[in-house]
């Protein structure tokens, strides 16, 4: 069963699919409201997945990304940035290994699917004589997300256990489970499984959950303070601007990687002058990644990183901006006020 075939099966469950993305299951506003109150289940076919194989896979990636690939030993995941030589981000990866890469397992990089082809092409340019194979496996494992107050409890009968720590990865007989950061009294997971097991697992979870579309998952990611890179925001941000140092997505102890000089200088000179904030925006129009935000004198001070409709009928967003501008007064997207809120992690200026 391919991802396309999987989504065809979801269409029989009232999934509304646009360009390969499950947008909702018939009632977007009710799904958003349910996301705040109960257990929700979401198809994640829209996420891209690269598989990095070969004897040199770990050492190759170590020279490409900001985090320490050697820490991925089969039971954990972490975020990591992929930068250009000027330290500006080309992509954000959620990196993990289903099995210890030193024992022959493979590494995976999950990313925004719209960036997959150009990023894969760029990575392959640097393989040269290394024993590395890079493949698009986005359609191989069936991926879905689970969030809610009873999410962990729902997984146990299906997998025998569930991970308890954020970014803990369990590889089990019928799939793998990755625990992701959540807010409130919820727990959040991504499930990876194969075509044979996917229907059974999905249907069992569906019986206890509200089915929701990608916008609900995006909103959950925003609440957790997890940024994203799109084609509109490539090469716009040094990793610290998106709080990646606060998300443990940068290693300052590992060896060299592309863009390291700029990233390290920003860290050691204490020169982080821009951060990403959680905000709400009251508007009838949807803020888009890359849209500029202004101060009261119409000077550009930052931009939208990602945004999604919220349950109250407006929008929540992650907004990158100058720290001094945020502290000086009101910030606007078009004519709408950008009202900042507390992130689930501490923001260090």
Regions of interest found by a model, annotated:
Residues 42-64, 135-155, 271-282:
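Short glycine-/aliphatic-rich beta-strand segments at the starts of folded cytosolic domains
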Residues 74-76, 162-170, 287-292, 329:
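Glycine-centered loop/turn motifs
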Residues 28-37, 80-92, 97, 127-130, ...:
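Short amphipathic beta-strand starts and helix->beta connectors
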Residues 1-79, 83, 88-91, 99-101:
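Acidic, proline/glycine-enriched N-terminal capping motif
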Residues 40, 49, 94-224:
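Acidic, low-complexity central loop/insert segments
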Residues 190-280:
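Anionic-ligand-binding alpha/beta catalytic cores of soluble enzymes and soluble regulatory domains
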Residues 93, 242-250, 260, 264-349:
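Glycine-rich, small/acidic residue-mixed loop/short-helix segments
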């Amino acid at each position: 069963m391919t991802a396309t075939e999987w989504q065809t099966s979801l269409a029989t469950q009232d999934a509304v699919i646009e360009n390969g993305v499950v947008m909702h299951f018939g009632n977007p506003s009710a799904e958003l409201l349910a996301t705040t109150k109960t257990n929700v289940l979401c198809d994640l076919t829209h996420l891209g997945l690269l598989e990095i194989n070969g004897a040199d896979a770990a050492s190759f990636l170590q020279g490409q990304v900001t985090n320490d690939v050697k820490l991925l030993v089969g039971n954990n995941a972490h975020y990591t940035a992929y930068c250009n030589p000027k330290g500006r981000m080309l992509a954000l990866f959620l990196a993990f290994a289903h099995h210890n890469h030193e024992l022959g397992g493979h590494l995976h990089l999950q990313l925004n699917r719209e960036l997959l082809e150009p990023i894969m092409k760029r990575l392959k340019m640097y393989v040269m004589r290394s024993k590395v194979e890079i493949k698009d496996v986005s359609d191989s494992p069936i991926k879905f997300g689970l969030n809610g107050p009873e999410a962990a409890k729902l997984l146990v009968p299906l997998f025998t256990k569930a991970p308890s720590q954020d970014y803990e990865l369990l590889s089990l007989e019928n799939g793998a489970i990755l625990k992701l950061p959540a807010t409130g009294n919820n727990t959040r997971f991504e499930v990876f499984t194969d075509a044979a097991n996917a229907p059974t697992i999905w249907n069992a979870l569906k019986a206890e959950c509200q089915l929701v579309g990608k916008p609900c998952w995006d909103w959950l990611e925003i609440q957790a303070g997890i940024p994203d890179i799109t084609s509109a925001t490539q090469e716009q941000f040094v990793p610290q601007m998106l709080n990646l140092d606060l998300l443990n997505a940068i290693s300052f102890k590992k060896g060299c990687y592309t863009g390291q000089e700029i990233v390290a200088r920003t860290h050691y000179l204490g020169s982080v002058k821009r951060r990403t904030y959680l905000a709400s925006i009251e508007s009838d129009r949807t803020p888009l990644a890359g849209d500029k935000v202004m101060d009261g004198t119409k000077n550009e001070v930052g931009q939208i990183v990602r945004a999604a409709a919220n349950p109250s009928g407006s929008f929540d967003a992650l907004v990158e901006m100058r720290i001094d501008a945020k502290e000086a007064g009101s910030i606007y997207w078009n004519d709408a006020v950008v009202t900042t809120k507390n992130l689930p992690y501490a923001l260090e200026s």
